[in-house]
Amino acid sequence: MADFQEQLRQYRAQKRRKETVDNFKDKLRRFWMLGTGANKDTTIEVQQVPTKFEAISENSQDEAVTSSESELVPEEQPTRSTDHHHKENNCLKYTLWTVYLLFWITLYVIAIKLSFGLVFLMFSALFGIYFNTRTEPKKRNEMSAYSVFNKNCESIDGTLKAEQFEREIRYGSGSVR
C-alpha cells in the first residue's frame, strides 16, 4: 500500500513539474509575441438571455397577452468592439512581423559585411524549419496533411508502402508486382 502511495505522490509531482514547465513556456511564448497570440485555454460560454416574449409567456401561460411587435423583438446590439479589437490585434501582429523582418534583414546585411552571409542564411533556414515544425503529437480528431487531400486515407498509387518496402528488402524487387 505504501508503494502505491509513493507512486501516486511521484506521479502528482511529475504532473506539477510538467504543468510548471508548460506555464513557463506559454508565458515565454506570449512574451516574445508581445501578447498577440490568443490564449489556448480561452473558453467562450454562450448564454441565452431570455427574450421579453419568453418572459411574458412564462408569467402568463393561460392569459392572452396583447402587445406590440416592438416589445416582443429584442433590440440587437452591434458587436463593434470585438471587431475593432480583432482588427487592432491583426494590425499589431503585422507590425510585429514587419519589425522581425527588418531586424532579420539588418542582421543579414551585417553577416554579409562580415563574409558570413551564406552561413547566416543557412542557419536562418534551419531555425525557420525547426520553429515551424511541430514536435508534440497530433491532437485527437485533428486532420493530418495526408487526410486532407486523401479523404478515405487510401494508399496512393506510386507511393512506397511499408509492407512493400519490407518485401523488397527481404526478397528482392522481383517479389513485388
Curated annotation (Swiss-Prot):
Keyword Heme included in the entry's annotation: no
Listed name of the protein: SAYSvFN domain-containing protein 1
InterPro entries (alphabetical): SAYSD1 (IPR039159), SAYSvFN_dom (IPR019387)
Disulfide bonds listed in the record: none
Pfam families, per the entry: SAYSvFN (PF10260)
Predominant cellular place of this UniProt entry's protein: endoplasmic reticulum
Segments traversing the membrane: none
Location(s), subcellular: Endoplasmic reticulum membrane
Segments of this protein annotated with the region Disordered: 57-85
Membrane-embedded but not crossing: residue ranges: 101-121
Annotated keywords: Endoplasmic reticulum, Membrane
Originating species: Drosophila melanogaster
Family that this chain belongs to: Belongs to the SAYSD1 family.
GO BP terms in the entry: protein quality control for misfolded or incompletely synthesized proteins
Any one cellular-component term (Gene Ontology): endoplasmic reticulum membrane
